[in-house]
From Swiss-Prot:
Residues 1-20 are annotated as: Disordered. This is Phosphoglucomutase, cytoplasmic. Mg(2+) binds at S123, D298, D300, D302. The lineage of its organism: Eukaryota, Viridiplantae, Streptophyta, Embryophyta, Tracheophyta. SUPFAM superfamilies: Phosphoglucomutase, C-terminal domain (SSF55957), Phosphoglucomutase, first 3 domains (SSF53738). The gene is PGM1. It is found in: Cytoplasm. It comes from Bromus inermis. GO terms for cellular component: cytosol. InterPro entries: A-D-PHexomutase_a/b/a-I, A-D-PHexomutase_a/b/a-I/II/III, A-D-PHexomutase_a/b/a-II, A-D-PHexomutase_a/b/a-III, A-D-PHexomutase_C_sf, A-D-PHexomutase_CS, Alpha-D-phosphohexomutase_SF, PGM. The keyword Disulfide bond does not apply.
Amino acid sequence: MVFSVAKKDTTPYEGQKPGTSGLRKKVTVFQQPHYLANFVQSTFNALPAEEVKGATIVVSGDGRYFSKDAVQIIAKMAAANGVRRVWVGQGSLLSTPAVSAIIRERIAADGSKATGGFILTASHNPGGPTEDFGIKYNMGNGGPAPESVTDKIFSNTKTISEYLIAEDLPDVDISVIGVTTFTGPEGPFDVDVFDSATEYVKLMKTIFDFESIKKLLASPKFSFCFDGMHGVAGAYAKRIFVDELGASESSLLNCVPKEDFGGGHPDPNLTYAKELVDRMGLGKTSNVEPPEFGAAADGDADRNMILGKRFFVTPSDSVAIIAANAVQSIPYFASGLKGVARSMPTSAALDVVAKNLNLKFFEVPTGWKFFGNLMDAGMCSVCGEESFGTGSDHIREKDGIWAVLAWLSILAYKNKDNLGGDKLVTVENIVLQHWGIYGRHYYTRYDYENVDAEAAKELMANLVKMQSSLSDVNKLIKEIQPNVADVVSADEFEYTDPVDGSVSKHQGIRYLFGDGSRLVFRLSGTGSVGATIRIYIEQYEKDSSKTGRESSDALSPLVDVALKLSKIQELTGRSAPTVIT
């Protein structure tokens, strides 16, 4: 059978602007007639012709509700637009880091390589018929489309009048591995359904010393727990942690991917990963002895949370500790780090490591594509952000399972001569040792979700206006908390990319204090309704005798300053944040 190409008339939808992580909306929005098709055609039209005609693209995601329908629609549109091959992870499941790896690494049996891919995910947002869906396009380097491309996509969505689709192309059974070939007006079109985990596992084995991690996991003194939060990480967890590294299956929690993430919010933090938090002894008291090490990943497995026994590692500390230990612990970095980078709201723990180890250091806006540019230019090896994203230049996305393996590698290295000893070096030991050398950045983030957009704008505008007179700001701060250090500089963060010279403005409001502490205020665009205000509060403590305080006590004066300075309750009516991290 030869499929035919149909031109379908359509009209633009408002608001199809892809943010730092693509287009995210409620499923019901994506189910509107032509809504997904408009965005997909606008993307094809924004790409160079050679990345569409005769090209190979990946289409898969975190398995959330509507993914299976979306794969079939995109495959039919790809065929109609002259794409030669579509690669699909079995069951439409591929983690975001795995898509990046597959675009960069996979060579199919016929020798083809991918030029890009559609990732179907709304990351850590909930899934289900009334929840969120998302789509983003990644380029040939495996990283998210840069602003030059996403701006073009958005512009196309505003003027689109028709799209191409092979309506008579039958649906492909994506649960079965194999290549299905169709014939169209321009020749053959293949849909290649392949195993979701194989390529990614192969890549991880080139980065980490699996044998040393295996020895750690085999030690009777070491216990391990991983929570997949019913996201796509489950497709990798059994393969890596159980089959390759020898962990017991009982150490895996919620590792069956589900379209609605089991009704949960697949965001690996202390609020939403409740089951893991309790098991690790950080929740309600339990008589069961917690494991030595616990970790979780989010819906599309690009975020991670690291826990020790009754101990939480902040993401800002996590990236700093990985960078400080990478060269000794991880074979991939044995010849040294090219540089390190963090997003602006992430604590300055990484800056201190970079300074001490004489590493190139970069502070970038929120959004993984900024790290990608540095990596493509060979300027950065390890990077991270406070929102539970950590990664390296092995791919161009953050990578939850990579971060877990990095921590297991550090633990394996620290315990290599100690596996038969009385006591293992623990996660907590490693963090305390790090603070002893580099000082501690007490850190918290307050999220106010679904705030009225106008109120949020007014709050941010006030904070910018106040920056014109720091003496007034300091006077106000002294009235709120007399012992807090003075603000020495304040600005709206702006970034000039050292690679391509592009400028990103309005990236968050910063108040920097004389003792190295910071307050940062940002409006976030990753939710699908309302605005989210994020307040980042960071208190630096150099004195190693004072690094063991309760975080909430150490931060209390600065929290008070942040809430009163921003007038958040007055302007938004919110007396407390939705989430505290």
